Amino acid sequence: MRRLPSVIAVTPLRRPLPRLACLLALAFAPVLQAAAPVALEREVNTFIGSKDDGNTFPGASAPFGLIQVSPIGEHYAGWRYDDPKIRGFGHSFLSGAGCWEQGGQVSVLPVTGSIGKGGDFNTDDAKSFDHKRYASPYTHDGEIGQAGYYKVRLTGYGGIDAEATARTRAAAERYTFSVDAGTGHVLVNVGQANERHSVIGSVIDVVGDRVVEGKLVTKSFCGGHQYTTWFRLEFDRPFKAFGTWGEEGGLAGARHRMEGEQKPSGAWLSFDTGKNRTVTAISAISHVDAEGARNNLRSEGMQGGKLLGFEQMRSQSQQQWRRELATTRVQGGTPDDRTVFYSALYHALLQPLTGSDADGRYRGYDDAIHRADGWTYYEYFSLWDTYRAQNQWLALTRPQVARDIGRSLLAINEQGGWLPRWGYANFETNIMTGDPVTPFLVDLWRFGALAGREGEAYTALRRNAFEQPPLNSRHAGRSGNPGYVDNGYVAYDRAFPSKGMDVDPHHGGSATLEYALADCALAQMADGLGHADDASTLRARGGNWHKVWDPQVRDEETGMSGFPRPRMDDGKWYVPSDGHYSPRSHHGFHEGTAWQYQWLAQQDVPGLVQAMHGREQAGKRLDAFFAYDALVQSPLTAARKEWVVGPYSYYNQYRYNPNNEPDLHAPWMYTLIGQPWKTATVVRAAQQLFTNAPNGVTGNDDLGTMSAWYLFSAIGLYPAVPGSGQFLLHTPRFTQVEVDLGTGRTLTLAADGADGRTLQYVQGVRVDGKDHAPVWLDWTRLQQGGRIDFALAAQAPTRGWGTQVDALPRSFCATPGAVLE
C-alpha cells in the first residue's frame, strides 16, 4: 500500500559529513579506496522517508538485521519526523511498509522521577505506565541518523541523551541522564508497541540485578495472524531497584508479570546515576524461543562472557555498513546527490530481515522450528513491491543474499504448503494482489540464484500458476485461477470471499494483467529448463492482457480509445451503476486506474503498441500520461505539479503515479517503443522527488522498493521486463558509478559531464570500448563486469541511438503477427 508526502520539501537536514570533507573525498576517491574505506555510513541520512508517509524508521539496524532500535511516536509505522514526542524505543521495525499493525515491540524509555504510590509514576494507577502518557518531548537539535547509529536528545525528565546501534541479531542502547538526576529509571513496556499494533499477550521477568526478558504476542500487518517475539535485555551494571506493572498498577520488587490482550504490562529498573550518568543495555530478540534471544545476545552482544560496550557495538555495526555501502562507489553529483544515493542504497539493504537465530534455527510457516545450516533464512517479503526493482538490485550486487532469499522462499513453500505473496514473520498475510512471487523467483533463476534448486522452484511455481491452495490453507495464492485458466481473465467480483484484506477477484482487471506478466516470466523459465509444452501454454497466457483490453473504451478528455477494463464472470464487460465506464475510475484495479495499469504489458510491446494504434499514437499516449511537454519546459519542478501527488490518490487519475508500484517501469516504455530520449526526460523529472529531506522518498519506500528504483535510475540501468534478464540503458545521474557484483567483478558506468540538474540524453553507448547500438544489455553480459560509457548530449537525438526497431529488445510474449514499425 502506498503513501505520498503531502509536503513538497523541508529544509535539508545537516549533512552527515561537512561539505568540504565530501568534496575532498570525491577529489581523492582513488587514494581513499586504496588506503581505507571512506566513512560512507555517515553519508547516509536515515531521516529520509520519515516524514509524511515514507514510513521509514530513523533508528539503528544492520544490513538485513533481525533487530532494529528506533523511536516510537504517533504513527503506525513507528515514528514521523514531526511527531511531538517519543513514547519509547522499539526493537522491531519494517522500512517503508504501508499496513498498520507492524513493529515497535519492547518499548523502552529512560525516565526520571518517583515511582511508587502517588509518585510521578503512580503504582496505584496503571495509566501512569501508558507510554502515550509518559512519552518524552525531544529536540531535532543534535539528532543523528547514520547507518548503524542513532542519537536523540530527550528534553523531558531533565534531559536525557539516547543512543542506539545494532548488529544483525543484537543491539545496544546507551542512555545518559542529566548531572542532577541522582536516580534514572528504564521502563520496559511489553504491553504496547507501535500505534495500532495490538499486543495480544505478554510476559516479562526480571532476572537477577542486570537482566529483563520475556515475550509478547502481537497481531500483524492489516489484521494478519498472531506471532510471538521473545526478547532479552542485559545491562552493563546492576539496577538498585525494580518492579513490574500490570492491569492493577505497579508493584515494587515484583519480578514477574503476565497480562492479556491490550493490557498494561512491563517492568521498571532503577539505577544510581549520581556518579555514573550512563546506562547501557544490550538487547536481542528472536522469533524462535527464549533461548534464541539469549543466544543471539551472547553471540553478537558479548565477548568472552562479558557484554560488549556501546562503542564496540557501534564500531562493528558501522564498519559492516561501511563495507556494504562501499560496494557501490559514485563520482560526481552534489553532496546532496551523494547522500540521497547512499541513503537509497542503505534503505534497499534493510530487507528482507534475517529470520534465523545465531544457531541457525528459525520458525517456519508450519510453526515448527527448523535450522538453516550454512545459510541465512530470511523473512518479511513484500513481493508485490520488491519484485519490480529491489529483488534485481540484490541479485545483481549480492548474489549470496539472493541465493539465500530464494532458498527461504522455497522453504516457505515446503513448510507452509504454498509460495508466499506478502510473508510477515512466519505466515502469509495475503496482502496485495496478482502473482508477484513468480516474476520474483524467475528473476532469481535468471540471475543464477536458484542454481541447484531450479527443479524444485519450477515445480512450486507451476503449481502456483495452474492451481489454488486448499481452503484450509492460510495462503490465497492465485485465487482467480479457476476462471483465469479456463477463460484467460480474472472475473471482477467484489463479493469474492477473502482470506485476508486483499483477494484477486476484488481487482479482476489488474489481477489479470499481473497474472499475464507472471505467466510470461514463467514461460521463459519453462523454456530454459526444457518444459516445451508448459512454455508454449504459458507464453500464450502471457498475452492474456488482451482479454481485458476493451478497444471501445474512450477517455473523454483526451479522446484516446482502447483501455483495460474488468470483465464479469459471464464474460461481459463491467458496467458501473451510472452506465458509463471511465478508464480513470477505480473499478477493478488495485491501487490504480486503467490509465496507469495499461502499461503493465511490457512483456508484449508489439501487441500493446498495436492495440494503441501504432508507435506514434502510443508515444502520444505516453506524452499525455507523463505531461511530457511540461517536463521538458520545467524538468526540476513539473513532476510535483503534473503527476499524482496525493498520499491516497490511487483512483480517478490518468497521470503517472511515481508513488506506487504499478507504474515503476512506465518511464522505460518510451525506450521500448524507440523513444529513449523521452525516458531520460521522465527519469530526470522523477529523480527530483528524491531529496535529502525527511519527505525525500516517493510514497511508502515499501521495504526498499522505491530506493532500489532510484538506484537503478541513477546508475543508468533498469530491469523493466520481469524474467527477461534485460536491463534497459538510460542517462546516468553521476559521472561514474562502480558497482561490485559480489563475484570479484566490477561493473563501471561512466557518463562524462552527467549533471542531475539538467536534461541530458544518450547520444551513444560503448561497452568495453566498442560501440553498442541496442538500448539494453542482458544479465549474462552484465555479470561479466566491465565498463559502459554513455556519451551525453543536451539536445534530444530523436533519430539517433536507440530509435531503430533493431535496437530494441525482443518481447518474449509478443502477440503473433504484431510488429513494431
Each language-model region and where it sits:
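Bacterial N-terminal signal peptides
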Residues: 19-30
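Accessory carbohydrate-recognition regions in carbohydrate-active enzymes
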Residues: 34-391, 395-439, 445-513, 524-547, ...
